[in-house]
Amino acid sequence: MSQHYEMIFILRPDLSEEQVNQAVAKYQEFLTENNATDLQTKIWGKRRLAYPIQKKVDGIYVQFNYQADGSQVAPLERMMRLGEDVMRYLTIKLDHVSSETAEEEESEPAQSEPVASEA
């Protein structure tokens, strides 16, 4: 049964743009070869880490959203763990994802209510 997954991983900050694109392409290729569908990639860019990892204070954040059965998750994480370009990774299984719902939430303006009223 196919599930929706979200993976965020942090690449080393000293990688060039070409090396970042090669690393992302390598992981995308792995997923597509293993029958993952609806692969969406967002490269967030270099950001400050909450705490130092491997004596580095910055990292390049990348997000994958994809649909697959669970058999791709462990091999992909193993591949990232053994590679030297990934500092951290996290994969979560999403309960239910609907692109229409996500778009509606983004397009609806926040309702503002007065916090305090004059007495």
From Swiss-Prot:
It comes from the Bacteria. GO terms for biological process: translation. Residues 109-119 have a biased composition (Low complexity). Pfam families: Ribosomal_S6. Transmembrane segments: none annotated. The keyword rRNA-binding applies. Residues 97-119 are annotated as: Disordered. GO terms for molecular function: small ribosomal subunit rRNA binding; structural constituent of ribosome. One of its GO terms (cellular component) is ribosome. Keywords: Ribonucleoprotein, Ribosomal protein, RNA-binding, rRNA-binding. InterPro entries: Ribosomal_bS6, Ribosomal_bS6_sf, Ribosomal_S6_plastid/chlpt, Transl_elong_EF1B/ribsomal_bS6. Belongs to the bacterial ribosomal protein bS6 family. Binds together with bS18 to 16S ribosomal RNA. This is Small ribosomal subunit protein bS6. It comes from Crocosphaera subtropica (strain ATCC 51142 / BH68) (Cyanothece sp. (strain ATCC 51142)).
